[in-house]
Amino acid sequence: LKASCQLLACGEFTIFEYRGMSTINEAQTVELFPELRTDLELLSLGTYFAQVAEVLSQEDDPNPALLSLTLNALYALGKLRKPQGLVKAVFELRAACLAGYTPDLEGCRSCGNPEPDRFDLEGGCLECAHCRSGDGTFVAVTPGILAAMRHVAACPASRLFSFCLGEETLRAFGSLT
């Protein structure tokens, strides 16, 4: 029972409910993520992912997509050794999408240009140079950043961490989340 209840452990639990009280009868450890326990930064980031997942979860309402995202992010940090900034940005953007805050990444909100040059953080949409409205908090986006955002928002969960970004692009991508 101890191993399954550790911080950043994934386990399957058998719960017995009687007269409004719940008791754990059995627990099976699925994954422990031991690599995250030996590095304070990784442990902190993994704990942050768990806290976000807790905030976005509803009691008695299973959310397999959020569980998969959280476990994949922990796996990407610990086993795959993906850059922390990349894993954090991917996790945050995909979690926002799962929570119903999917950004409009089709093209410019005004003219439909498929390759706009800035993203409105408040409005969650893209805008190009010709259509600058001035309203909102904008961040410049390159084609690489836009491709990464589109990938994270729309790809299957199994392909979520299957891309790399250069250092500068990664820093800019991280500033969007």
Where are the language model's segments positioned?
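Non-catalytic alpha-helical scaffolds and adjoining flexible linkers that form interface surfaces
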Residues: L1-T177
